């Protein structure tokens, strides 16, 4: 079971191909973070496969997996986007776009045939991808006076947040990133250091 502050995604673009009754289904799984990125990839693949009969897709965004869409691109309703999304869901993936391009082979597949083909093509692309589990991280900025540097650095060493930025004058600043589930503890420890202030 995935923890609340982790999610599964893919590291790089991966492809899969499925053929059924001379129809060719080319699937591309792409890691994405925003709707804008999704639009760019869709534009690029629609241009690349301009001669294809259909370019269908599904995506999932956000570590909570609540932002998703499935598109049939002219195929009968529910026969393309939904089975693609089903493969994303069965692998518990997010921040992912899966596009399936169909070249019609002259023989109709029927509704159930299309569902099987789009599902199989999406499964091939996802199977070819490297799936990783990532943490949901949060950032915090703390300001403190230089004489209390050792206290701050001891906490950083023990709790192991990533140091994103730091500046050392009489007033020092440090921007840190740590996994969401550990943020409460880190914040509480930093706030106990004399002169330390959390900057929102």
Feature map (PLM): residue ranges:
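Short glycine-/aliphatic-rich beta-strand segments at the starts of folded cytosolic domains
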Residues: 131-146, 174-176
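Short amphipathic alpha-helix segments
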Residues: 143-160
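Conserved short beta-strand edge segments in small beta-sheet-based binding/regulatory domains
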Residues: 162-168, 192-200
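C-terminal regulatory domains involved in ligand/effector binding and gene-expression control
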Residues: 1-78, 165, 192
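Terminal, non-globular segments
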Residues: 176, 182-185
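Structural motif
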Residues: 28, 55-57, 95-98, 139, ...
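Signal for well-folded cores of large energy- and translation-related assemblies
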Residues: 46, 88-89, 119, 123-130, ...
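Active-site beta-strand/loop microenvironment that shapes enzyme catalytic pockets
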Residues: 80-128
């Amino acid at each position: 079971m995935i923890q609340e502050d982790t999610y599964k995604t893919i590291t790089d673009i991966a492809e899969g191909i499925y053929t059924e009754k001379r129809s060719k289904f080319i699937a591309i799984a792409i890691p994405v973070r925003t709707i804008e990125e999704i639009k760019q990839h869709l534009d690029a693949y629609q241009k690349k496969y301009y001669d294809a009969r259909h370019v269908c897709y599904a995506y999932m965004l956000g570590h909570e997996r609540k932002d998703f869409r499935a598109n049939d691109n002219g195929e009968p309703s529910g026969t393309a986007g939904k089975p693609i999304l089903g493969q994303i869901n069965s692998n518990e993936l997010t921040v992912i776009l899966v596009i399936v391009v169909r070249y019609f082979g002259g023989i109709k597949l029927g509704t159930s045939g299309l569902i099987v083909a789009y599902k199989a093509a999406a499964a091939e692309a996802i199977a070819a991808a490297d799936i990783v589990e990532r943490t949901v991280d949060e950032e915090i900025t703390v300001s403190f006076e230089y004489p209390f540097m050792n206290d701050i650095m001891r906490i950083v060493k023990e709790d192991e947040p990533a140091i994103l930025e730091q500046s050392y004058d009489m007033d020092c600043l440090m921007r840190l990133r740590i996994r969401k589930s550990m943020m409460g503890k880190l914040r509480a420890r930093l706030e106990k250091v004399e002169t330390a202030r959390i900057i929102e």
